[in-house]
Amino acid sequence: MNVYEGNLVGTGLKIGIVVARFNEFITSKLLSGALDGLKRHGVEEQHIDVAWVPGAFEIPLVAKKMAESKKYDAVITLGAVIRGATSHYDYVCNEVAKGTSHAALSSGVPVIFGVLTTDTIEQAIERAGTKAGNKGWEAALSAIEMANVMRTFS
């Protein structure tokens, strides 16, 4: 039996990050966490590209474009969608998740879902570097691991 696992060594990896500007006080913290995680695991700063988009709904298109360019070993998506009083939240969350998955499957490049989908602003803050850790950091580690496991199949 063969077992394949990625490792957390980022040396030589090229990573793209797509960040939503909407709720930037949260997404900027997710980005800081992701950048810290990438650099601490060996990804060089000059091998990281960051693209800002207006909101979470716009993330999948840019993530797909980055992935299809084949310039990146993985793409990380970062955003924060917080439930409001209307059904808009459900539509945005569903489409961003589907679009992110489609970008990965159609390109063959790992596209990591680092978009917070929370009921409250407090939950988003907790996941952007306080009580619940930083989901940007976690997305960065997932990107490194997935990029490395994909290399085993090249």
From Swiss-Prot:
Gene3D superfamilies, alphabetized: Lumazine/riboflavin synthase
UniProt-listed Pfam families: DMRL_synthase (PF00885)
InterPro entries tied to this protein: LS, LS/RS, LS/RS_sf
Superkingdom classification of source: Bacteria
Name of the gene encoding the protein in the UniProt record: ribH
Molecular function via GO: 6,7-dimethyl-8-ribityllumazine synthase activity
Disulfide bonds: none
GO biological process, one term: riboflavin biosynthetic process
Pathway this chain belongs to: Cofactor biosynthesis; riboflavin biosynthesis; riboflavin from 2-hydroxy-3-oxobutyl phosphate and 5-amino-6-(D-ribitylamino)uracil: step 1/2
Catalytically driven reaction(s): (2S)-2-hydroxy-3-oxobutyl phosphate + 5-amino-6-(D-ribitylamino)uracil = 6,7-dimethyl-8-(1-D-ribityl)lumazine + phosphate + 2 H2O + H(+)
Residues holding 5-amino-6-(D-ribitylamino)uracil: 22, 56-58, 80-82, 113
Function, in words: Catalyzes the formation of 6,7-dimethyl-8-ribityllumazine by condensation of 5-amino-6-(D-ribitylamino)uracil with 3,4-dihydroxy-2-butanone 4-phosphate. This is the penultimate step in the biosynthesis of riboflavin.
Assigned protein family: Belongs to the DMRL synthase family.
Description of how the protein assembles with itself and partners: Forms an icosahedral capsid composed of 60 subunits, arranged as a dodecamer of pentamers.
Keywords: Riboflavin biosynthesis, Transferase
EC number(s) stated in the UniProt entry for this protein: 2.5.1.78
Active site residues per record: 88 (proton donor)
CDD domains xrefs: Lumazine_synthase-I (cd09209)
Residues that coordinate or bind (2S)-2-hydroxy-3-oxobutyl phosphate: 85-86, 127
CC terms in the record's Gene Ontology section: cytosol; riboflavin synthase complex
Record's protein name: 6,7-dimethyl-8-ribityllumazine synthase
